[in-house]
Amino acid sequence: MAVLKQPQHHHGKHGGRSFYQLIAYLMLTSRLDNYGMLFTSFGGAGIYKSQDYTSTTSQASILRLAGLCTAHCVLLGAAGNTWNDWMDRDIDSKVARTKDRPLASGKISSGEAFTWMAFLYSTSVGMLKAMLGDRNVWPFMVPLTAIILVYPLGKRPIARKLRIYPQYLLGIAVGYPTMYGWAAVYGPCMPISEILHRCVPLWIFLFFWSFYANTSYSYQDVEDDRKMKVNSAYNLAGKRIRALLAILASIALSTIPFVLRPFSSAWLWLSWVGAWVPGIIQQLLSFDPSKPESGGVLHLSTVKLGLWTVFACTLELYLSNRAVI
C-alpha cells in the first residue's frame, strides 16, 4: 500500500509533467514509498557473529555492515519491483488495485523505468562491494539477479502448469541476503559452500515467512487475478486459503529453534518466540477469506514482526559477544 499520494494533475501520458511528478512516479514504481520494502531489511539479520567460528570483526563494524546490507537489499528490491511492474504492466492495468501504477497507466515510459532500474541496480551493487570488501560480489549477485528477472514469469499460466508459484522465487530472494552477512563478517576465508551451510536455518525461516506474507498480500487481488488466470499460491489453496497460511506459518515458526540454537541467549528466545507465536496466531484469527483486503492487514503485521526481530537482534549484539544483527 503506497504511502506517497499519486500526483493529481496529469497532462496526457507525459506532457506537462514536472520533474517532481516524474520522481514521485518512479518512487511509486519501485515501492521506495511502500512499507513492503521494509521486508528486505530483515536480510540484514543474516549477519551472524558466531560463537563457534573465529572472527575479529567488531560490533561497530557489524552494525555498519548491517546498514550496508539493508541499503543494498532495499535498492535491489526497488530495482526488482520496477522490473516486475514493467513485465506486469498489461496485467496491472486490468486489476483494480494496480491499474493506477505509473507503468500500467502510462504515466512513465519504459525508457524512464529502465533508466531508473539501472541506477537502482548499479547503486545496490556498489553497496554490496562496500560491504564485502575484497571479495568478488558477482558469485552472489548473479543468482539473485536471475531470480529477480524470472520472478514475474512465475505469475503466468505456464508456471501454474509446472506447479511453480511466484512465492517460491520470492522466498528464495528474500532469504538470499543472509549469505552476505557471513561473507562480510568472515571475509574470503570462508568458502561459499560453508556460508550456505550456516545460513540454511535462517534462509528456510525467511522463505516460509515471505511465502506466508506474500500469499496473504496477493490475496487482495484474488477476484481480478482469477478472472485473468494469474498464477499465485492462493490458487493452489482455493477455499482453504486460511489452512495454507496456517501451514506456512507453522513451518516458519518450527524453524526458529534451529535459527537460535547456536546462541545461548535467553533474550533471543524470549524476543523471537514471545513475539512470533502470539503474533502469528492473532494474524490467522483476524484474517477473513471473505474480505480479501484483510490480506494486506496481515502482511503489514508480518512486517512489524520482522522489524521487531531486527531490533531484538541488534540489542543482542550489545548484550553479548555472540551476536546476531
UniProtKB/Swiss-Prot annotation:
Pathway(s) where this gene product acts: Secondary metabolite biosynthesis; terpenoid biosynthesis
Transmembrane region(s): 60-80, 113-133, 138-158, 169-189, 192-212, 243-263, 267-287, 295-315
One Pfam family from the record: UbiA
Record membrane topology: Multi-pass membrane protein
Endpoints of the signal sequence: none
Gene Ontology BP, a term: terpenoid biosynthetic process
Reactions catalysed: 6-hydroxymellein + (2E,6E)-farnesyl diphosphate = verruculide C + diphosphate
Superkingdom classification of source: Eukaryota
Subcellular location: Membrane
Enzyme Commission number: 2.5.1.-
Any single Gene Ontology cellular-component annotation: plasma membrane
InterPro entries tied to this protein: Prenyltransferase, UbiA_prenyltransferase, UbiA_prenylTrfase_CS, UbiA_sf
Cofactor(s) essential for the protein: Mg(2+)
Keywords noted in UniProt: Glycoprotein, Magnesium, Membrane, Transferase, Transmembrane, Transmembrane helix
One GO MF term attached to the UniProt entry: transferase activity, transferring alkyl or aryl (other than methyl) groups
Glycosylation site positions: N214
Application notes: Compounds in the chrodrimanin family such as chrodrimanin A or verruculide A exhibit strong inhibitory activities against protein tyrosine phosphatase 1B (PTP1B) and therefore, they could potentially be developed into drugs for the treatment of type 2 diabetes or obesity. Furthermore, chrodrimanin B, the end product of the pathway involving chrodrimanin A or verruculide A, does not exhibit the PTP1B inhibitory activity, while it functions as a potent blocker of insect GABA-gated chloride channels.
Similarity-based family: Belongs to the UbiA prenyltransferase family.
Functional note: 6-hydroxymellein 5-farnesyltransferase; part of the gene cluster that mediates the biosynthesis of chrodrimanin B, a meroterpenoid that acts as a potent blocker of insect GABA-gated chloride channels. The first step of the pathway is the biosynthesis of 6-hydroxymellein by the polyketide synthase cdmE. The prenyltransferase cdmH acts as a 6-hydroxymellein 5-farnesyltransferase and produces the hydrophobic metabolite verruculide C. The FAD-dependent monooxygenase cdmI further converts verruculide C into verruculide B.
Protein name: 6-hydroxymellein 5-farnesyltransferase cdmH
